[in-house]
């Protein structure tokens, strides 16, 4: 118990003097996969081939979710309860998309980990080469260390960062978020950070000039379009996932 108390005191002491004026922002990144200030909106959660073809008639890119299975296949699913006999593979998904190499893809790799990082990387590289999409695909994961293996192979990587609510003043939870993210990025270089749009203030305060990819879950009404249009004005924000039927 004593050891735990000492650790908490030390951490708290180190954090209490921090604010956005005396904390250096992390400034990166020279490589940007997509940078079109007039067309930042991509379609969120497009896990069916028919929907992909329909949305790619108006959207320049789509986001999809994949799980890597021990049978050396990626399955396109948002939930880990998928049935391999009823769920399309990433190979089938890409095979069914019209002019597949003409579009952009944000691949949310749900279960990337130390156990599957080597084999899943080989499989991803194979699919990217086969369909000619390596230069227009983002691979995203919460696992910054395993994702680094993908970055080392010149795959564009986005580190998914969870952040507690932030109103411009750093709470203890925010300080812990900041410390963790900074430490992870110092260990493993990535091309972008991805998070919910609610976290934009935190990201722009402490990760200046970093490429940002945002999703906007919950913003679906007509009035919410103004909020999303405001997100477009940030130069660091490169991609915004939306749940509307058409870009605007």
PLM region spans:
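Sec-dependent N-terminal signal peptides
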Residues: 5-14
């Amino acid at each position: 118990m004593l050891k735990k108390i000492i650790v908490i005191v030390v951490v708290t002491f180190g954090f209490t003097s921090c604010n956005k004026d005396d904390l250096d922002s992390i400034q990166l990144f020279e490589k940007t996969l997509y940078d079109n200030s007039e067309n930042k909106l991509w379609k969120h959660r497009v896990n069916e081939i028919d929907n992909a073809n329909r949305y790619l008639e108006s959207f320049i890119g789509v986001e999809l979710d994949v799980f890597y299975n021990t049978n050396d296949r990626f399955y396109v699913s948002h939930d880990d309860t998928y049935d391999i006999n009823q769920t399309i593979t990433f190979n089938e998904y890409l095979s069914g998309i019209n002019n597949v190499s003409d579009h952009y893809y944000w691949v949310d790799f749900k279960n990337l980990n130390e156990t599957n990082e080597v084999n899943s990387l080989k499989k991803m590289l194979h699919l990217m080469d086969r369909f000619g999409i390596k230069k227009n695909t983002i691979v995203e994961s919460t696992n910054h260390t395993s994702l680094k293996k993908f970055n080392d192979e010149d795959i564009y990587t986005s580190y998914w960062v969870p952040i507690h609510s932030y109103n411009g003043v750093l709470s203890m939870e925010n300080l812990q978020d900041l410390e963790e993210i900074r430490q992870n990025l110092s260990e493993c270089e990535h091309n972008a950070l991805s998070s919910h749009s609610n976290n934009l203030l935190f990201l722009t305060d402490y990760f200046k000039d970093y490429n940002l990819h945002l999703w906007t879950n919950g913003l679906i009404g007509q009035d919410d379009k103004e909020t999303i249009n405001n997100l477009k004005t940030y130069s660091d924000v490169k991609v915004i996932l939306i749940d509307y039927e058409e870009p605007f």
